[in-house]
Amino acid sequence: MDEIFQYIKGKTILVTGGGGSIGSELCRQIAGHEPKQLIIFDIYENNAYDIEQELRRKYKNLNLVVLIGSVRDSRRINMVFEKYKPEIVYHAAAHKHVPLMEKSPNESIKNNVIGTYKTAYAALKHGASRFILISTDKAVNPTNIMGASKRLCEMVIQSMDAVSKAGRMDVLPLLHAHMDKYFEDQIPGDRTTAAMKNQTEERSSVHIESVKNKDRQGTQFVAVRFGNVLGSNGSVIPLFKKQIEAGGPVTVTHPDIVRYFMTIPEAVSLVLQAGTYAWGGEIFVLDMGEPVKIDSLARNLIKLSDLMIFTGKGFHNANTIQILLNNRIQTVI
C-alpha cells in the first residue's frame, strides 16, 4: 500500500525478535519498502542468520544490520539505539509458548514485561518516533501467564506514551540494570551510595536527552493485538499436526476456548498498516474474521488426516482428544 511505503521508505527501522516467525515476516515486508536501514535484533543466532541470508539474496541494495543480543540487557539495547538511532521500532521479541510459561512464569515476566520496558525506555530516551508492540488476543482477560505478561506489556506501552506526551521521562523508574556500570569499581559497602549517585546522574541525563529531543513530537507508543497466526512459532496448528503425526493424543486446554486465525503475511501487513495510523496510546485489534473453537479445529484436523476420534479426560484437567489409529486408542502412558 502507498501509505505503508511512504511510512517506511527512507527510515531506519529496528525489529526486535527479528528472527522469529512474526519478526522475520516483518523484516521481509519492511525490506520491500525501501527503508534507509533495517536492523534485526535477536537473541537466537540461527534464526537471525537465516533471515539475514534470505534478505541479502533477495534485496541486494538493502542496508541491513543483524545484531545478536537480549532485550533484557539494558546496556546492549541502549548501545543499539545510541549507535543506530532507529526511528521506528517493531517490538516482536517475546516468549510466546503458553505451557512453557506456566512452568517458568518468572522468565515470562523478565523477557516479556521487563524486556519491553527496557526497549521502550531506550526508544523514548533516544528519540525514536514510533514504537509498535506486537501483542496477542491472549492479553484480553488473560487466563494464563503468557497472556497476563502481554497485558502488562500493553500497560507499559500506554504508560510510556503518557510519559512521552507529558515530556516527563524523568519520572520513569530506573531498573537495577541501568545502574550496574557504577558497581564495577565499588566495594560491596559502597553499592548503596553508588546506586543513589547513579539514580541522580541517570535522571539528569534523561532530562538532558528529553530537552535535546524537544523539537520532535515525542515517541508514539502503540500496541497491535492479534490472534493465532497460522504456522507461527507457538501457534496451535503446528502443535496439533505434530500430535496427530505421533498418533495422539491431541490436547485442548478447555473445549469452549475460541481463537482467531490468519496467515503470517496477512497479520504483518495489518501490523504495518496500524503503525501508519497510530497517534500514540492505542491498542489496535486486528479484524481476524470469525472465531474458531479450538476443540472443533482439533477434531477437523484429525478428520482431515483420515483418523477417528475418541474423547477422554487428560492430565491437568485438559480435554484430551485421543485418536483411534489402526483400531487402537493412542493415549499417554
Model-derived regions, located:
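Conserved residues in the N-terminal Rossmann fold of short-chain dehydrogenase/reductase
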Residues: 67-68, 110, 254
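Conserved Rossmann-fold NAD(P)-dependent oxidoreductase catalytic core, especially the SDR/UDP-sugar
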Residues: 85, 91, 95-154, 158-161, ...
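Conserved mid-core alpha-helix of short-chain dehydrogenase/reductase
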Residues: 76, 118-122, 261
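Mid/C-terminal beta-alpha module of Rossmann-like enzyme folds, strongest
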Residues: 277-333
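N-terminal Rossmann/SDR dinucleotide-binding element
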Residues: 1-85, 187, 195-198, 203-207, ...
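A conserved pocket-lining segment of Rossmann-fold NAD(P)-dependent short-chain dehydrogenase/reductase
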Residues: 101, 216-228, 239-262, 266, ...
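Hydrophobic/aromatic anchor residues within beta-strands of the central parallel beta-sheet
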Residues: 66, 108, 221-224
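Short mixed-charge
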Residues: 162-192, 197-198, 202, 206-217, ...
